[in-house]
Amino acid sequence: MNGALTVGTLDGANVEMHRVLGDENMFLFGLKTEEVAETRRNGYNPYRIYSRDPAIHAVLDQINKGFSDGVRYEDLHERLLFGNGGTPDEYMLLADFPSYCEAERRMVETYADRTKWNQMSLHNIARSGIFAADRSIADYAERIWKVPYKK
């Protein structure tokens, strides 16, 4: 990790990182596990979000138009809104977007405060030993792979 400050959702490896580093040393955003389940139960509809949120509408319209790089992004636009044979916005990106924008705002604000940014970075360096590759491999060898390893 080398002092990197994480911007991310509270899933996957970020759950363990959050447990070790705490809220104050990460920029978390997005729906929590129980909120994802509830949103799905209530009939998640990304097109409704697109229709009601001007910022998301503008972003997706720009994606649909492209970025003058010669690459066409209509498929991404269509998959997010309509699924194109799959689940629309399977990872609930549109639901997370406002929260992501807020996390980005907090990150930019924190970066402007060099002392605070450096304190957070140093904290993450000091607490990241548990995530070292050697420790992780030893843990996997013992708990998951059940193979001997040399200490």
PLM features per residue range, with description:
Residues 1-121, 125-130, 135, 139-151:
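Catalytic binding pocket for nucleotide-activated donors in carbohydrate/polymer assembly enzymes
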